[in-house]
Structures are given as C-alpha cells and as structure tokens.
Amino acid sequence: ATNDGGVGMLQALGYDFLDKDGNQIKHGAIGLKDLVQIKDDKAIPELKDCEFHIACDVTNPLCGEQGCSVIFGPQKGATEQMIKDMEHWLADYAKIAKESFTKADADKPGTGAAGGLGFAFLTFTNATLKSGVDLILHETKLEEEIKDADIVITGEGCLDAQTAMGKAPIGVAKLAKKYGKLVLG
C-alpha cells in the first residue's frame, strides 16, 4: 500500500524531492512533511519521449473529502491522525509541484488513485489516465459474454461507497444493464 503521491516511483526515475537542507526526503508519506523543493534535472531523459496510458480504477482527487488519504487510508490501516497528517502533506506536495510543473492539478479525477500515483503520472510524465474497468472490459471482450449470459456475478467481496468510485463491479453492472441482465455482487 502506498500513499506518498507517487514520490517513491518518481525518485526511482531520478526526480529529486528535497528538504530544506537540499537532502532527499525520507521514503514514504512521512517524508512529504519535509518537502520544500522538487527537481527534475536528474530524471531519466527518455521519460520525455514516453507516453503512458495508466489504467485507473478510481476517480478520486489527490486531496480533500474524497482524496486518497481520507477514502483509502482507513483500508490501509491509517489512524485518524495519520490521515490528517497525510492529507496535509499531500496538499503541500501538490502546491510545491504546481510551482515548477504546470500540469500539476490535485483536483483532477484519478489523481488520488494508488495513493497519489495518478497525480505523479499526470504531473511529471506524458500520461493519460484511463478507466481501468473500461480498459479491461474492452481487452477481455466481456460485452460479448454478458450479451449471452442469463445472470452476471461480479465476485466483489464488499460493495461499498468505494465501489461506486469507478471500481470494476460498477463497470460490469453498467454493461449488464445495457442488456437487461441481473447482476449479483
């Protein structure tokens, strides 16, 4: 589980996330509390030539009431205080990113996916976020199977508010509805 806004991935790609003394911040979300500057001069140069198509299963923004810390933190074991801290650190990170990287938009749908990896991809790379469920439904040609089915069972372990935020069972249910099929979670 991650909730560092994609910083760990970006550090591996050569980005510098620096504290007030010019040192790399600690790994994980806790390092964000010391972040004051982001530099890309050591980033892998080939990144500029790459296009990324990211399968994203949620539409949550990076921060706020529907952000990754508030919505997904509890399922990752975060306490209320940890959620407040991570929310604050991610908001500061987004502001710092916006100073040097014009594509930074923490409110864009999907930026809160995978603990903020969506934000990292959109801000620091040539990426587009695509609905993970739409991508999978297309690649597996599930529509052909649903058309001929009597009943559709998603196998989702728990249907909750997060399910409605773009998870696979909703995509399957919408497709089944198109053909008037009964769906069980």
Where are the language model's segments positioned?
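Short glycine/serine/threonine-rich phosphate/pyrophosphate-binding segments
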Residues: 1-8, 117, 161-172
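Glycine/threonine-rich beta-strand-loop-alpha-helix active-site module
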Residues: 2-50
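Short beta-strand segments
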Residues: 51-59, 154, 184-185
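Acidic, glycine-rich loop-and-beta core segments that form the ion-binding/anion-interacting portion
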Residues: 58, 62-101
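Short glycine-rich anion-binding loops that position phosphate/pyrophosphate groups of nucleotides
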Residues: 59, 127, 157-161
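Oxyanion-binding "anion nests"
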Residues: 85-152
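C-terminal non-catalytic interaction/assembly regions of soluble proteins
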Residues: 150-151, 157-185
